[in-house]
Amino acid sequence: MTKIKNYTLNFGPQHPAAHGVLRLVLELDGEVIQRADPHIGLLHRATEKLAETRTWIQNVPYMDRLDYVSMMSNEHAYVLAIEKLLQVDVPLRAQYIRVMFDELTRLLNHLLWIGCHGLDVGAMAVFLYAFRDREDIFDMYEAVSGARMHAAYYRPGGVYRDLPDQMAQYSKSKIRSASAIKRLNENRSGTLLDFIDQFTNGFDANVDEYCNLLTDNRIWKQRLVNIGIVTPERALQLGFTGPMLRGSGIEWDLRKKQPYEVYDRLDFDIPVGVNGDSYDRYLVRMEEMRQSNRIIKQCVAWLKANSGPVMSDNHKVSPPKRVDMKTNMEELIHHFKLFTEGMHVPNGEAYSAVEHPKGEFGIYLISDGANKPYRMKIRAPGFVHLSAMDEMSRGHMLADAVTIIGTQDIVFGEIDR
């Protein structure tokens, strides 16, 4: 008599829907998943160990390369942990700038997520729409830091520099017509804040476009509704955070529950799901984009009305002004020590977490008083979410594995570290 056995399928790490270098070993009964075993580590770069050999400020660019689609949110957790150890006060204007760019980063992340999630499931148009808005946010990154992705803009004590008074404009090009360049430069004649203001005024309408393409689309609903259900109790037991937890109906958001920077001064809502399936998580993230846009508008209004410093005046943490450096020996010494040796952080340990686009992103630092960390531990939200892959996909069809990976919104830079 013939014995029927389950068969094993390797999904990835080269698969286009694997969102990076994910290898899934799937045990299938026909097309039904019986077991899903994620294999990670293919993008491991020893970031935590490298941090022990670099100064505190040299580690900021490494943060950008963890979750490489939510760059400034990673930096934020790191500098908050250092500020806890240093006991330094951050100027209010710098706090508003950080919050504004945190929320722009959330838009950047969620736009890539909806584009790729749609593409994985078979909806190609939304991918093209999403990248239109991402280009504008990359221009904002470039305006403050000179880099379109890996900004390294946040610093312990504030931010690298104030917002520019003039938004950069597109110049003549062989790849664009004169009319296209004129259209691109229409809203770039003012300051960066003017550019962000115009972006936010039109962004809610763009989110409506994405919703019109997907929310009531019957194929989209067939692919997401009742797929990857996680109950509220199980979500807590598994350690879910961010949209994965809120999609299961639990209203937990660090911006509200443990406010940092100026979030307690801002007005916004926390969207939550009901059923805990992939469709609810989609709805939560779409509403999060609207709420982030609302926060950005409030930050822009405050920043336009209020000026001030964007960096701590403690010159053991931040460099002195160039004019002071040329007239004052002590300031010159501070500058020399800061850029050759780096700051010395007092003995101690600190944990700091931010409401990252993917969940709670935490940095745990131990200092032994030296100019570099003694130990750094990164709490990556995607690591926890991917560990639930087996439980979320068991009993679903093979094609649903792609949907579940998409709804988890995983990026291997932070998972493998």
Curated annotation (Swiss-Prot):
Its EC number is 7.1.1.-. This is NADH-quinone oxidoreductase subunit D. Keywords: Cell membrane, Membrane, NAD, Quinone, Translocase, Transport, Ubiquinone. The gene is nuoD. GO terms for cellular component: plasma membrane. GO terms for molecular function: NAD binding; NADH:ubiquinone reductase (non-electrogenic) activity; quinone binding. PANTHER family: NADH DEHYDROGENASE [UBIQUINONE] IRON-SULFUR PROTEIN 2, MITOCHONDRIAL (PTHR11993:SF10), NADH-UBIQUINONE OXIDOREDUCTASE 49 KDA SUBUNIT (PTHR11993). InterPro entries: NADH_Q_OxRdtase_suD, NADH_UbQ_OxRdtase_49kDa_CS, NDH1_su_D/H, NiFe-Hase_large. It is a peripheral membrane protein. It is found in: Cell membrane. It catalyses: a quinone + NADH + 5 H(+)(in) = a quinol + NAD(+) + 4 H(+)(out).
